[in-house]
A protein has these predicted regions:
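N-terminal lobe of the biotin/lipoate ligase/transferase fold
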Residues: 1-98, 116, 124, 161-162, ...
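Flexible loop/coil segments at beta-strand boundaries within sensory signal-transduction domains
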Residues: 111, 122-127
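Conserved, helical-rich catalytic subdomain that frames metal- and/or nucleotide-binding sites
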Residues: 159-208
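Short glycine- and Lys/Arg-enriched binding-loop motifs that mark or flank ligand-binding interfaces
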Residues: 39-44, 108, 130-132
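A structural signal for short, well-ordered beta-strand segments
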Residues: 60-62, 106-108, 118-120, 133-139
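Short, acidic (Asp/Glu-rich) active-site segment that either coordinates a divalent metal cofactor
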Residues: 127-158
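Catalytic palm active-site di-aspartate
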Residues: 96-112, 137
Length: 208
């Protein structure tokens, strides 16, 4: 896995997002880390809604400390993380380039159907500030699909099996690179606003 993140994969957990926060609060933070689970039992969805489990998904949370100016809350973080996840998916499957889009602020969509999303939270612990990004991507719908919103999955779109470990690996690589090198916040903002912007333009913001 990417050396920036201390990564751990779990068979099952209640929520990678909640577990990441719990670990920091218990004093377990020793640098940026990531948690993924093959199955979540109480995942967190958008606006406090329960996570809808597709049956085969990327459920991944990233946790890192922020200091100085970086510690100021910024509502743009979900969009920035979503852009990096979008780039990672296109790297994994280039044929997604013309169809994978970001619905502001944090939904990844294909043909107006939700493929996944990102949640970002920030909290303080013992005088330090931490940020946690939860990432969920539908890889294959095995369970019944939700009736409340149209959804899709990567396997159906690609028409072939999806390697979950490779998708996770690429997300870790791109997000690590983005967090380490992103300087041009204006460029990231422009990419968020222009849903038709070529994804390769994001490399200019991350030094790729």
């Amino acid at each position: 896995m990417n050396p920036f993140w201390q990564h751990e994969e779990l068979e099952t957990c209640h929520s990678t997002q909640s577990l990441a926060i719990e670990r920091v609060r218990r004093g377990g933070y020793q640098g940026p880390f990531s948690l993924s689970a093959l199955r979540q039992t109480e995942g967190v969805g958008q606006r406090g809604n329960p996570w809808v489990d597709s049956g085969m998904a990327v459920t991944l949370s990233l946790a890192w400390e922020v200091q100085g100016e970086e510690s100021k809350p910024d509502e743009r973080w979900p969009s920035w993380i979503s852009l990096w996840v979008q780039q990672a998916l296109v790297d994994y499957a280039p044929e997604l380039t013309p169809v994978l889009r970001l619905k502001w602020p944090n939904d990844l969509i294909i043909s107006n159907k939700k493929l996944g999303g990102v949640l970002v939270s920030q909290f303080a612990h013992e005088g330090r500030t931490f940020r946690v990004a939860g990432i969920g991507i539908n890889l294959a719908w095995i369970n019944p699909q939700p009736e409340t919103f149209p959804s899709t999955d990567l396997q159906s779109v690609l028409g072939r099996p999806v390697d979950r470990s490779q998708v996770v690996q690429r997300i870790l690589e791109v997000t690590a690179h983005g967090l380490e090198t992103a300087k041009d916040r204006d460029l990231l903002d422009r990419a968020v606003l222009d849903l038709r912007a070529p994804l390769k333009s994001l490399g200019d913001a991350t030094g790729k």
